[in-house]
Amino acid sequence: MANKKIRIRLKAYEHRTLDTAAGKIVETATRTGATVAGPVPLPTERSLYTIIRATHKYKDSREQFEMRTHKRLIDIINPTQKTVDALMKLDLPSGVNVEIKL
């Protein structure tokens, strides 16, 4: 291939599904003969939302909700055409966002 590296960035709300998806990608890439660096855990984004429990008054009574976005980075170095074909056919769990840069 002309490009020497494929960078895959994974995002998910649950870290277990993210780790299984990363494991599938790493296993597929190593099986087809490419060199893999990662999965590298990136910092987790944490979004915190505070709402008032009551509808009209009692502003001191609040509730907080949090949403965490876990991220992983995988570099595939010197991929072959067989590696790219295998990655295109790979079935990943739902709930995992995949960004690929060539």
From Swiss-Prot:
| Subunit details | Part of the 30S ribosomal subunit.
Q: Which Pfam families match?
A: Ribosomal_S10
Q: Which organism is it from?
A: Streptococcus thermophilus (strain ATCC BAA-491 / LMD-9)
> Which InterPro entries would you find in this protein's record?
Ribosomal_uS10, Ribosomal_uS10_CS, Ribosomal_uS10_dom, Ribosomal_uS10_dom_sf
Keywords assigned by UniProt?
Answer: Ribonucleoprotein, Ribosomal protein
**Record GO terms (molecular function):** structural constituent of ribosome; tRNA binding
Q: What does this protein do?
A: Involved in the binding of tRNA to the ribosomes.
Name of this chain's protein: Small ribosomal subunit protein uS10
Q: Does the keyword Ribosomal protein apply?
A: yes
Q: Which Gene3D superfamilies match?
A: Ribosomal protein S10 domain
Q: From which residue to which does any coiled coil extend?
A: none
Domain of life of the organism in this record?
Bacteria
BP terms from Gene Ontology: translation
Name any GO cellular component annotation.
Answer: ribosome
Q: Which family does it belong to?
A: Belongs to the universal ribosomal protein uS10 family.
Is-annotated flag, keyword Ribonucleoprotein? yes
